[in-house]
Swiss-Prot record:
This is Isoleucine--tRNA ligase. InterPro entries: aa-tRNA-synth_I_CS, aa-tRNA-synth_Ia, Anticodon_Ile_BEm, Ile-tRNA-ligase, Ile-tRNA-ligase_type1, Ile-tRNA_ligase, M/V/L/I-tRNA-synth_anticd-bd, Rossmann-like_a/b/a_fold. GO terms for molecular function: aminoacyl-tRNA deacylase activity; ATP binding; isoleucine-tRNA ligase activity; tRNA binding; zinc ion binding. Catalyzes the attachment of isoleucine to tRNA(Ile). As IleRS can inadvertently accommodate and process structurally similar amino acids such as valine, to avoid such errors it has two additional distinct tRNA(Ile)-dependent editing activities. One activity is designated as 'pretransfer' editing and involves the hydrolysis of activated Val-AMP. The other activity is designated 'posttransfer' editing and involves deacylation of mischarged Val-tRNA(Ile). It comes from Mycoplasma mobile (strain ATCC 43663 / 163K / NCTC 11711). Transmembrane segments: none annotated. Belongs to the class-I aminoacyl-tRNA synthetase family. IleS type 1 subfamily.
Length: 885
């Protein structure tokens, strides 16, 4: 039945559309921000204030952005937007990492060239530069769709000559401080990349390795062991047996001679039971036992190069955790082997080429890939009655982080940064650095503690050259004048000049024509990105910068290299706080891969739902651990978004006739409770923002909105729609709505920039700015809970009453709460002072001896649709009758 009094009601006006149309709105407001230079105005507004710098760790300029990029950049953007609103001068300077193997490999693949040595270095570098720049352009375009608070006009790229020159200054400082050295020693070597790798470029994956026990025949014994006895050796790298030149034992360990089938075998006493069980030996006999030191000097026949013998030596790295207690030594294929080998003068055999193939030193195994030679080596040992046991071992094994192929330890001449001399200084520099999560700083410290050196040379073309000249004696020259000369050239012409010019053309005049040569290797890309605190200049914001925020893998990567370089150059850490996030997995917690078909792309989410939904997912993710994404998770965030949007719609629709200049009122009663709850929300969300806990921001806001909707908004409807426009209760509600809207706009602006800008442009408030992103975030130092405590008894009563009403509706006693006659057994004096009929939104309330619900036989007011004991001849309640007079 049509309400004939409808025209007399204060019907809310739908100012904010129900449908968000985010894709269209995001383009509209992006244009608005750009045309009106909102980002620049925010910087100008805060220019004289304290700076806040979140330094952008550079993503790699290769390929489209993945969901991990979105997680990272949006987290950063939320921080920057919040700090800007809080009055800080917060420029965000994005950057790109542009050198390195993936780009080089991409060019080689496009040109259909198998080996980088089959193309001129200059041509490869030219193509790589062009490709990197095209990728920056592509990624920049994709980043901009995420509604980031930066114009992306001021950005850095590690291939810029000025940046490269700053990088060389860091190298120069290290060199002159005595931290740079060249040495032959085993390093991580990637056959798939044909280059050395630093620890930060190695990832550990499950790997299937050969596991063999082999016998080395003794040819020169002593009083403890005899000629033709056998040493038992365990290895998971049969291919390194070609380079065997020693066996190590632990001085104080006990070793036993075991007789089995008329042969004697030597291995650690503590491992006798374990090893014999592996071999399946039943009837063996322990003949004698002795210490490791008693075996030193014994010689054995090498397992592959059987024409040669090798000695037993002492080794600090021998353990009883696995194997046999005797360790096969190949000095160029293990760091401990190398160190001991140098002391004991063991032969150093390099039988592996750069690409992993076996060279002429491998005898009959030459020209085979090292891994492919394993079965043949095992067969050779078997034919020579030296293979005691063969199986496969599944274990965590180092892989090249770019190619995902296994790496090996391989001796080669490389350039290193010595970490040991500066380790104490590095550790001291992070004593006062904070981290979120809190374990971050201890993880970084542990990684620094475990480093002795940093391999910085790479045998590739696309990168910053190591600026070293060799004199006529082939000795590296470390002279400041030479470094400064090259730095000056690079700042003007870029690093291509190192490859374009001959050695004499590069040298200052007094060094020419002396038969000098130049280094061919380039620097590790982690050295590039680790130089950003020197290469990136932000006016008025010196190092250390406030926050570095990256994935948790960067504790061994960018956090690590940045810290080392900064301590060398600035004598301090480059950051005050470290924030790290996990990886993005699919909805079931699985790693994403194209083969599984579970890859979620940020551009797909943005084009379907809008960037604000993607940003809400980021803010609503517990990012300190791995996070998940998928259709269900996105839909959950869509529902939260709708709740926020619909709340704004309701609030603003009921503020159309509200004038903040004259209608703001002092609050009483239930309205004072809502004000107190709003102040609590402000206090807690500010703490959450300060602590990078964005999930708490969403959780707190969502809970506030939910509680608001479940009571106060419903309670307010009758007063808003049916009371006089100037009614005091109505103005109190609108005062709350006004303040709630203002607060929610600020809380959600860093997370939902488009939606909040849309609402802000509609909303009329005091001291309104051109954009919500030029507003000032609220400050609040304390909260009160006086009203919360006071009103607790009411909400306890409300819950009891509505539980009874639910039963009454189910039993068809009443159709709605509006028809409920509520009997309340209550002695609380505060409750007796309240207008419980209106607060509970029921037909009538009577205090009695028991709690119960009956059907209220009242009269329905045709205007407000509420039941009363009495209505007038026009079917109006007292209130409505007065309003329409």
């Amino acid at each position: 039945m049509k309400n004939k009094y409808k025209e007399t009601l204060n019907i809310p006006q739908d100012v904010l559309p129900m449908r968000a149309n985010l894709i269209e709105k995001e383009l509209k407001f992006k244009t608005f921000w750009d045309q009106n230079k909102i980002y620049q105005k925010a910087l100008e507004k805060n220019k004289t204030n304290k700076p806040f710098i979140l330094h952008d760790g550079p993503p790699y300029a290769n390929g489209d952005l993945h969901i991990g990029h979105a997680l990272n950049k949006i987290l950063k953007d939320i921080v920057v937007r919040y700090k800007s609103l809080s009055g800080f001068y917060a420029p965000f300077v994005p950057g790109w990492d542009t050198h390195g193997l993936p780009i080089e490999n991409k060019i080689l693949k496009e040109l259909k060239i198998d080996d980088h040595k089959n193309i001129s270095t200059l041509e490869l570098r030219k193509q790589a530069r062009e490709y990197a720049l095209s990728q920056i352009k592509n990624q920049k375009k994709q980043f901009l769709t995420m509604q980031l608070f930066s114009d992306f006009k001021d950005y850095y790229q590690t291939l810029d000559p000025k940046f490269e020159a700053e990088q060389l200054k860091v190298f120069k400082k290290m060199a002159l401080d005595g931290l740079i050295y060249k040495s032959l020693q085993p390093v991580f070597w990637s056959p798939s990349s044909q280059s050395a790798l630093a620890e930060a470029e190695v990832e550990y994956h499950e790997h299937k390795s050969h596991s063999i026990y082999t016998a080395f025949k003794i040819v020169k014994g002593n009083k403890f062991v005899e000629k033709n006895d056998f040493l038992v050796i365990w290895t998971t790298t049969p291919w390194t047996l070609i380079a065997n030149s020693g066996v190590s034992v632990k001085e104080e360990f006990s070793y036993s001679k075991i007789n089995y089938e008329n042969k004697n075998y030597i291995f650690a006493t503590d491992l006798v039971q374990k090893v014999t069980e592996i071999f399946g030996w039943k009837n063996f006999k322990i003949i004698s036992s002795f210490q490791g030191k008693d075996l030193v000097g014994i010689e054995y026949q090498r397992p592959i190069k059987q024409e040669k013998t090798a000695p037993i030596v002492l080794g600090h790295h021998v353990t009883l955790e696995s194997g046999s207690g005797l360790v096969h030594m190949a000095p160029l294929f293990g760091l401990d082997d190398f160190i001991i080998g140098r002391v004991e003068k063991l032969e150093e055999i390099m039988h592996i080429n750069d690409d992993g193939s076996i060279n002429e030193f491998g005898n009959q195994f030459a020209n085979k890939f090292y891994w492919d030679a394993n079965p043949e080596i095992n067969e050779f040992l078997k034919q020579n009655n030296l293979l005691l046991h063969h199986s496969f071992l599944y274990h965590s094994y180092p892989h090249d982080w770019r190619t995902n192929k296994p790496v090996i330890y391989r001796g080669s001449n490389q350039w290193f940064v010595s970490i040991d001399p500066i380790k104490e200084k590095i550790t001291k520099s992070i004593e006062h650095v904070e981290s979120y999560p809190t374990w971050g700083i201890s993880r970084l410290k542990t990684m620094i503690d475990n480093r002795t050196s940093w391999t910085i040379s790479r045998q590739r073309a696309w990168g910053v050259p190591i600026p070293i000249f060799y004199n006529e004696k082939n000795e590296p020259v470390f002279e400041e004048e030479l470094f400064d000369h090259i730095i000056d050239l690079v700042s003007k012409y870029g690093t291509d000049i190192w490859f374009e010019k001959s050695t004499d053309e590069l040298l200052p005049e007094k060094y020419k024509n002396k038969n000098w040569t130049k280094e061919k290797d380039i620097m590790d890309v982690w050295f590039d990105s680790g130089t950003t605190s020197m290469g990136v200049k932000i006016e008025g914001a010196p190092v250390p910068w406030d926050v570095y925020l990256e994935g948790s893998d960067q504790y061994r990567g960018w956090f690590n290299s940045s810290l080392i370089n900064s301590v060398v150059y600035y004598n301090q850490a480059p950051f005050k706080k470290l924030v790290s996030h996990g990886f993005v997995l699919d909805e079931k917690g699985n790693k994403m891969s194209k083969s599984k078909g579970n890859v979620v792309l940020p551009q797909e989410i943005i084009s379907k739902f809008g960037a604000d939904i993607l940003r809400l997912w980021v803010a609503n993710s517990e990012y300190t651990s791995d996070v998940t994404i998928g259709e269900n998770i996105i839909n959950q965030n869509v529902e939260i978004y709708r709740k926020f949007r619909n709340t704004f719609r309701f609030l603003i629709a009921n503020l159309v006739d509200f004038d903040y200049k004259k209608d703001l009122k002092e609050l009483t009663g239930i309205h004072l409770l809502i004000k107190e709850q709003l102040e609590t929300l402000k206090f807690n969300t500010k703490i959450a923002y300060e602590n990078f806990q964005f999930t708490n921001v969403i959780k707190l806001t969502n809970n506030f909105v939910y509680n608001l909707s479940s009571f106060y908004l419903d309670f307010s409807k009758d007063i808003l729609y049916a009371n006089k426009i100037e009614d005091l209760q109505r103005k109190m509600i609108q005062t709350n709505f006004y303040n709630i809207t203002k607060t929610l706009l600020l809380i959600l602006a860093p997370i939902l920039p488009t939606t909040i800008e849309e609402v802000y442009q509609i909303f009329d408030q005091a001291n309104k700015k051109e954009s919500v992103h030029l507003e000032n975030f609220f400050g609040i130092s304390s909260i009160e809970t006086i009203q919360e405590e006071k009103w607790n008894s009411f909400f306890e009563l409300k819950n009891k009453v509505y539980a009874l009403i639910e039963i009454a509706i189910k039993d068809k006693l009443i159709k709605s709460a509006n028809q409920a006659l509520v009997y309340i057994k209550e002695t609380d004096e505060f409750l007796k002072t309240l207008d419980l009929k209106n607060l509970l939104m029921v037909g009538k309330v009577i205090f009695s001896k028991e709690n119960k619900i009956e059907n209220y036989e009242g009269h329905l007011c045709e205007r407000c649709r509420i039941y009363f004991d009495f209505i007038d001849k026009d079917n109006l309640c007292v209130r409505c009758s007065k309003v329409i007079l």
